[in-house]
């Protein structure tokens, strides 16, 4: 995180359950999450890497780190946004994800864009 408001990136996440890609009898629950990353600062910046902590309903945690997102390292001008969708498989009906993106501004300043925890959950239906 960087306290200077010139280096600020906002992240919004919309998760959803993918019933057609899940096989609950085999302990496979598929979720997609759509992400909107917006440069809310004053300096253009590039997303360099991602860091995720994925926790299932049994408390098992997995760390996932990698370069960029969906094969890209998008550069965002002030006010510009980048959207992408990705997915995750859990062995339980619910879990959560949280993490951060490593960013580098055009002036060389490195900072972190936090991704607040969000819930992955199979929707309940009433019969």
Swiss-Prot record:
Q: Which residues form a coiled coil?
A: none
Output the GO biological process annotations, alphabetical, semicolon-separated: error-free translesion synthesis
Domain of life of the native organism = Bacteria
Q: Where is the ApaG domain?
A: 3-127
Position of the signal peptide: none
**InterPro entries reported for this sequence:** ApaG_domain, ApaG_sf, Uncharacterised_ApaG
Please identify the protein, giving its name as recorded.
Protein ApaG
Organism, by scientific name, is Xanthomonas oryzae pv. oryzae (strain KACC10331 / KXO85)
- Its gene? apaG
């Amino acid at each position: 995180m960087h306290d200077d408001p010139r280096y600020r990136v906002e992240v919004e996440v919309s998760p959803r359950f993918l019933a057609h890609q899940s096989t609950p009898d085999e302990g496979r629950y598929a979720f997609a999450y759509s992400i909107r990353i917006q440069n809310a600062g004053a300096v253009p910046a590039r997303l360099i890497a991602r860091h995720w902590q994925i926790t299932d309903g049994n408390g098992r945690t997995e760390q996932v780190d990698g370069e960029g997102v969906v094969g890209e390292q998008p550069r965002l001008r002030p006010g510009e946004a980048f959207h992408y969708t990705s997915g995750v498989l859990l062995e339980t009906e619910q879990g959560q994800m949280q993490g951060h993106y490593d960013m580098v501004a055009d002036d060389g300043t490195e900072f972190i864009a936090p991704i607040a925890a969000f819930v992955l959950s199979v929707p309940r239906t009433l019969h």
